[in-house]
Amino acid sequence: MEISQQAGWCKKPASPMNTRAALEAVRNTAWTIVLLTSAAVMGASGISRVSANLGHSTVMTCPNRTNISMVTWKINPKTGHQCTLAYLIDKDSTGKNSCSDRINWRSRPDWDQALEIQQVGKADEGNYTCEVVNADGNFHYLYHLTVLVAPRMALYCDDHGNPVCEAETVKPAAEISWVPESNSTPRADSHGNGTVTVVSRFAARSTNGKNPTCIVSHATLNETRSINCSSRTLAQLPGGSAP
């Protein structure tokens, strides 16, 4: 059966018998068509959940396949538009559609098809798909990216001389504990911008002469600080300021 250029790429599912013919059609098609369309998937793996710290870089890799003819990265953020990177190996040609300059190949795509995001932001959260084409068909690998934000923390004395520890995060919420152990229950307040502030007020009956110590636990940071409210001495945790 004769395969037209349009049917060969846009509509015909890839199969071991027709893959070479489909790739021949791709070579004669504009890069905009390559970037905005998707071939059928012959093989797939599960979703890998990855996380990156806000403002840092992160890398996602493609599945290891031999005799690759084309590689495509498709980015579907929770907010904003889809963007696509593509590389046609036979022609040593790359294409890019709607992607930020921060999102690009980690190195030369002819020998490293990994995707790198520089200065990761909250808007980068979402699904990332690498599609690889070779003589056996099309294969893809899925990632779900979560962006972590380090807590903003403060340790201070309230108007009654009680130690108060605060930690503000986007997600997940930080955990706060005290030494000596306090019988107070931390309060978590959610805000419209997606952040969560956890507040804990030290309420132990006795400290045995020791300064209360606040312990903040989070995926991106673990900090321990002490404070002496009997003399109203202020101690701060890095990244925060007391009111």
UniProtKB/Swiss-Prot annotation:
Which positions form S-S bridges? Answer: C62-C130, C165-C214
Q: Which residues lie on this side of the membrane: Lumenal?
A: 48-243
Expression by tissue, per the entry, reads: Expressed in peripheral blood lymphocytes (PBL) and peripheral blood mononuclear cells (PBMC).
Which Gene Ontology terms of cellular component type are present? external side of plasma membrane
Q: Which SMART domains match?
A: IG, IGc2
Which intervals hold domain Ig-like C2-type?
A: 144-228
Q: What is the designated name of this protein?
A: Cell surface glycoprotein CD200 receptor 1-B
Source organism of the structure: Gallus gallus (Chicken)
